[in-house]
Swiss-Prot record:
Highest classification ranks of the organism: Bacteria, Bacillati, Bacillota, Bacilli, Lactobacillales
Official protein name in the record: Cell shape-determining protein MreD
Domain of life where this protein originates: Bacteria
Topology versus the membrane: Multi-pass membrane protein
Organism of derivation: Streptococcus pneumoniae (strain ATCC BAA-255 / R6)
Keywords tagged on the record: Cell membrane, Cell shape, Membrane, Transmembrane, Transmembrane helix
Compartments it resides in: Cell membrane
Length: 164
């Protein structure tokens, strides 16, 4: 049963990415002047460190990164690299991060910040964006971090029931 759970979750990962993207697009239609990026997927990855080995977890991160790259950037490499690095960071520190709710909330905020800032910097270096850092912070980073803080505040209890 445990193996079935691992394989089933692995097959559903691309759909989780697409659902996350559509949530972001839906929220963006309500707030057209800011760029909201839902990273509900980070909440899933945070708790998934409990269930799978480190290597399988990094495969999860690699697949999510590939799907994310193809769907959003049409350039393979930016989020694949970031997801693998963040996944390794999460898996190494999961015993500390999963101690209580506050550390999970802080981890979600830090993950969102590192991912958004890393993807902005890599996209800027590759030439995919020309926005200045201040525009990015005000109209994208801060609203995204607030949204993801709300996600973990609301959905953390559901994930705790399932995983803990």
């Amino acid at each position: 049963m445990r193996q079935l759970k691992r394989v089933g979750v692995f097959l559903l990962l691309p759909f989780f990415v697409l659902i996350d993207a559509h949530i972001s697009q839906l929220l963006g239609s309500f707030f057209p002047h800011v760029h909201l990026a839902s990273h509900f997927l980070f909440l899933f990855l945070l708790f998934e460190t409990i269930e799978v080995s480190e290597y399988l977890y990094l495969v999860y991160c690699f697949v999510i990164g590939l799907v994310y790259d193809v769907y959003f950037f049409h350039l393979i490499g930016i989020t694949t690299l970031l997801f693998i690095l963040l996944g390794a960071f999460l898996h190494k520190l999961n015993s500390v991060i999963l101690l209580n709710r506050w550390t999970r909330m802080l981890a979600m905020i830090v993950l969102t910040f590192l991912f958004e800032m890393g993807s902005y910097l890599l996209a800027f270096m590759v030439g995919l964006t020309v926005d200045s850092m201040s525009i990015f912070i005000v109209y994208s980073l801060v609203p995204t971090m607030i949204l993801n803080f709300l996600w973990i505040t609301v959905f953390q209890f559901i994930f705790e029931k399932y995983y803990l």
